[in-house]
A protein has these predicted regions:
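Extended alpha-helical scaffold regions
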Residues: 1-266
Length: 266
């Protein structure tokens, strides 16, 4: 019926956002139907390019690559099977880091409890093996954020972090990238509220970088409050020319019902 068609459409629309998962399913289907030559082309392209931040897709990709090369030569080696094992480790670490960040955030804001012993065990494991995993984008981004959330007065974690953020943020799915940016903006705002005005520049430069990536958008539009905050900080930093261009250039990025009021006010 019509509702089932709508469900399928919504599922497909969401699926379209995940190219790595699509590629893995195409490879799997090609191998099941014995069209291995085409499967091999995709496998070579995927395994020779930079790894995705989607650890589940990486895990399945390397499993399929191991299967493909083993069938091809009847000899093969363990390279891709070992890589699938590494991808599984990254999947575990990445998701644990994300969950612990959210648990710490809720603890800080809402005073909700978490299991301290589990947290200590996880941190001990991660720190003992950090040299093996710190180059992965999810670990290099979420671990410093977790350090801050665990100790909100600390600043050491932020040293060199912005460079990592700018380097890797495009590799994350849009909604996840927005969550990451929100953590960093909150950190900057807390420091600004403590009178640390050097963080105005940090907040502003992060906003400037994220704007063309649509990572400050609320669905399709920039909220009137984001628009106002960027303008306010730009003026405080005397970035008058950039701010004036932003006021006019992002007028159409505001929701239609808020557009004129926000524009005229600012």
């Amino acid at each position: 019926d019509l509702y089932k068609l709508l469900e399928k459409y919504l599922a497909w629309k969401q699926f379209e956002k995940h190219q790595d998962r699509k590629d893995v399913l195409v490879i799997e289907n090609l191998m099941e139907t014995a069209i291995t030559e085409n499967a091999g082309k995709i496998i070579r392209r995927k395994t020779q390019s930079e790894e995705s931040t989607d650890a589940v897709s990486n895990f399945k990709l390397y499993q399929l690559a191991d299967q493909y090369y083993f069938q091809l030569s009847r000899k093969g080696d363990n390279t891709h099977l070992i890589k699938s094992q590494e991808a599984l480790d990254i999947y575990y670490l990445s998701n644990q880091l994300k969950i612990w960040c959210e648990l710490m955030n809720r603890s800080n804001i809402l005073a909700l409890q978490y299991d301290n012993m589990k947290f200590d065990r996880f941190i001990q494991f991660l720190e003992n093996n950090l040299k093996d995993y710190s180059h992965y984008p999810t670990v290099s981004i979420y671990y410093p954020i977790l350090q801050w959330l665990k100790d909100p007065n600390s600043d050491g974690w932020y040293e060199g972090f912005r460079e990592k953020l700018f380097l890797h943020i495009k590799e994350f799915p849009e909604n996840e990238a927005k969550d990451i940016v929100a953590y960093i903006q909150n950190y900057c705002v807390k420091r600004i509220n403590q009178g640390r005005n050097e963080f105005l520049k940090e907040w502003f430069e992060i906003a400037q970088f994220m704007l063309p990536l649509n990572l400050l958008n609320d669905n399709k539009y920039i909220s009137e409050w984001t628009y106002k905050n960027i303008i306010t900080v730009g003026v405080r930093l005397h970035a008058f020319e950039w701010t004036e261009n932003f006021i006019h250039g992002y007028y159409n990025k505001l929701a239609p019902e808020q557009r004129d009021n926000a524009y005229q006010y600012n």
